[in-house]
């Protein structure tokens, strides 16, 4: 079973305090595991044979609030999320994540479509686990690319700026744009490909890649979107 909240904070609060001092906001990966997580035997060859175990839940975050006050956390709530996980996130006012690259499959109720965003969320064009926006767009099948194009207003620029502008104009309270998208880079600049072990987390940019007027373009878009 998970350790009691007291045990956790007594051993980790000092380290957590140091992290909080150096960061504006932290993302909690696999947030659903704080409500329930999938436990498998250590000797299991696959993850098939396991069971759901109740996580530390609200007690942990209540204790962290006692120690640190307001928690500047973003809940990574991607994948299959239960009502109980949503309730835990909302109880503490943690924004969830909206990934625009996930927005164009399914119907009008797709939670990643901009029309379905809410203020208590963070919108991304894509994350470290996604392709770059340009790489993603070029890799789409023709029918899927047409679906994306149909959603975008005709006056939007081409990719990746169309998706960047869409993210900035979302109702989400915060928008995060990967550097690769701002530099208009393709799949060669992808940060991470889940399930693989080679070439990940190695991409770096150099200042000579940054166009002279990029700062002005970003400023104009953010101001027009009411984020300046």
Where would I find each of the regions flagged by the language model?
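Active-site and adjacent substrate-binding regions of carbohydrate-active enzymes
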Residues: 17-228
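Single conserved hydrophobic/aromatic residue that forms the stacking wall/gate
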Residues: 1-16, 20
